[in-house]
């Protein structure tokens, strides 16, 4: 059987510096994720760090996105090889790795997604990603079709951005604005000039190494500014945020 994710179109689009507009998925529900997958976003983050997701909730969401053109990206809870291996085996190919601060941590993320000798991924001959052993060329194709996006969200990460961006196998640099703001002494204020300066610096250094940059920006003016600064994969909202604001607006309309 053929695996319809080879070649990885999202990885290719990032490499070609094509703008990719995405959305965050935090509701952890296959129906809401299926609806989100119909909206036309280029990519969707299924969040395993701050949302109540695990293997048992990710699988039905991946099933719900089977017919969607939106590329699923999983944000792992932590940069840990066993966790990443399990997410690979259930069918994720695009990974967002939080809180990467050094080149060594970036290298670990890459190695965790690659079979030997390029990496340390454990081998199972039958799992959901290889359609339970029916994809004949899975081992040959897997390593080169994995996307690794590393998240910079600390002062140490900013200091090491050049080394991180230069890491072989890293496909893009993603800014975590909220944690970055907190790390720079401006908790809850990602709009502070110091934070904005750091964000632009990260974008510039990523570009200098030929790597695309991205960010979460649910405020339209912020998203458009980041695109002007050179970011190419931008998440412009979240299912949770849209649901909350829309229901609040609806209630307010009739309860005034």
Curated annotation (Swiss-Prot):
Organism: Escherichia coli (strain K12)
Protein name stated in the entry: 5-keto-4-deoxy-D-glucarate aldolase
EC assignment: 4.1.2.20
Site annotation Transition state stabilizer: residues: 75
Record-marked site positions (Increases basicity of active site His): 89
Cross-referenced SUPFAM superfamilies: Phosphoenolpyruvate/pyruvate domain
Regulation of this protein's activity per its record: Inhibited by acetate, chloride and bromide ions, nitrate, fluoride, cyanide, EDTA and pyrophosphate.
pH-activity note: Optimum pH is 7.4-8.6. Stable from pH 6 to 7.5.
Binding of substrate, residues: 151, 178-179
Cofactor binding notes: Binds 1 Mg(2+) ion per subunit. Can also use, although less efficiently, Co(2+), Fe(2+) and Mn(2+).
GO BP terms, alphabetized: D-glucarate catabolic process; galactarate catabolic process; glucarate catabolic process
Gene for this chain: garL
InterPro entries: Aldolase/citrate-lyase_domain, GarL, HpcH-HpaI_aldolase, Pyrv/PenolPyrv_kinase-like_dom, Pyrv_kinase-like_dom_sf
Keyword rRNA processing attributed: no
